[in-house]
A protein has these predicted regions:
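Flavin-dependent oxidoreductase catalytic core characteristic
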Residues: 1-178
Length: 179
């Protein structure tokens, strides 16, 4: 920061660290929101999903921030010390939490529940939103899923009739303010 503004040259020099910090901030917020959702809806399944996500992230971050191929940033490169890690990611309670809540058996339970009973309470708490969700699920099941694999594997464009039907559902106007 120079004169209260980000220094573009410095940011460019530290772009891997900046990318890692942005990733960490995003993951932290995802953990907060997922945990808040699970607490709000109060279901056992939803809590299991949130705990698995938090536990998996805590376990994965021990090795650094993995941003993709050839982009793994060591936590020390972000200024974290061994003492910082001992108090957080390497703390015995955090490791025990990860070991208890982010296992292959837990993931299998989550997948089986999702397959057999759905994805749990989405917490929409709005009849209209639930109806919209149902309409989109029906559209996806009837129109998208039957052609999705072919479109993907052959790298085809999404057929215009699908896009037109999506437009009729209001997809392309969802983010445009009414005024």
């Amino acid at each position: 920061v120079v004169n209260g503004r980000l220094n573009g040259d410095r940011l460019n020099d530290e772009q891997l660290a900046a990318h890692a910090l942005a990733y960490l901030a995003t993951e932290l917020e995802a953990c907060r929101q997922l945990s808040a959702w699970a607490a709000r809806v109060g279901g056992e399944f939803e809590g299991k999903v949130a705990r698995a996500y938090v536990g998996e992230l805590a376990r994965n971050l021990r090795g650094g921030v993995d941003l993709g191929a050839c982009e793994n940033i060591a936590l020390a490169d972000l200024g974290l010390t061994d003492a910082d890690l001992a108090d957080t990611l390497l703390h015995p309670e955090v490791q025990a939490f990860s070991a208890a809540h982010s296992t292959g058996a837990i993931y299998l339970e989550i997948a089986q529940h999702a397959r057999d009973k759905g994805f749990g309470n989405l917490g929409l708490d709005d009849e209209m939103l639930e109806e919209i969700r149902g309409q989109f699920a029906k559209f996806s099941d009837q129109k998208v899923i039957p052609i999705a694999q072919d479109v993907h594997r052959q790298d085809k464009l999404i057929p215009m009739d699908i896009l037109e039907q999506m437009a009729e559902l209001g997809v392309f106007g969802l983010t445009i303010p009414e005024e």
